[in-house]
Amino acid sequence: MQIILLEKVVNLGNLGDVVRVKDGYARNFLIPNKQARRATDSAIKEFEARRAELEKLAAEKLAAAQAEGEKLNGLTLQLSQKAGVDGRLFGSVTNHDIADALVAQGFKVEKAQVRMPNGPLKTVGDHPVVVSLHTDVAVDVTVLVQGDAV
């Protein structure tokens, strides 16, 4: 299916690109999330008329993400979990736990934006985590997991 991208999509293209994707990807993900439209002649003409407005919105989203990223960059987040004497946690710290802790500190972060390169955290100590605020803005956050004695 031919679609017009209404915003930048990772590994697919930028705003205004006409790309070919699988029908299911377009119908079930891109179009419902308002990231794309079918590339009909009328849709292309309408898009060209609204192009400046959409580019302005994309620039505002990027600026907001960069401002949030400057506040988040280099942040050390402290979480405490029950742990055994060997430093292993009972359970784990997931991206959901980290997102909740960041929201409690006043940041607008969803769990899908928290990237954990080594999977859930299962040990006590410092762990690097990447928070992807925008397709172009990713910041590093250090999570300090402290163990509570059982």
From Swiss-Prot:
GO molecular function, one term: structural constituent of ribosome
GO cellular component: ribonucleoprotein complex; ribosome
Keyword Calcium: no
Domain of life: Bacteria
Swiss-Prot/TrEMBL GO biological process terms: translation
Keyword terms: Ribonucleoprotein, Ribosomal protein, RNA-binding, rRNA-binding
InterPro entries according to UniProt: Ribosomal_bL9, Ribosomal_bL9/RNase_H1_N, Ribosomal_bL9_bac/chp, Ribosomal_bL9_C, Ribosomal_bL9_C_sf, Ribosomal_bL9_N, Ribosomal_bL9_N_sf
Annotated family: Belongs to the bacterial ribosomal protein bL9 family.
Role according to the record: Binds to the 23S rRNA.
Protein name: Large ribosomal subunit protein bL9
Species of origin: Ralstonia pickettii (strain 12J)
Lineage: Bacteria, Pseudomonadati, Pseudomonadota, Betaproteobacteria, Burkholderiales
Gene: rplI
